[in-house]
Amino acid sequence: MRKIETQMQNALRNRVNWSSGNTTVFNDNEGNQFVTLHGNLIAQISNFGDIKLSSCGWETNTTKSRLNAILDTFLNGISVFQKDFVWYIGDDEFFDGYTIHR
């Protein structure tokens, strides 16, 4: 895992606003958390724990790595991966807006 992703995970766990390079974590007044990559909203974590993910149309290794670091922060054993140029999450085909209800 990249250093920036470890720092991002710490910000998410500690519920603090943080920014470094192309990645930003911010929180709203209702306890929701948001992660952006290059200004694109790639993850929303609700105050109830639901996780909504998006590549924002950028299915790159960096986007996938950030999404997996976010998933690793809150869940065990689930990840975004690529097979034959198609992204998957668990057994499902990944799509922008994919939501994990917890």
Predicted segments with their positions:
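Terminal leader/tail segments of proteins
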Residues: M1-R102
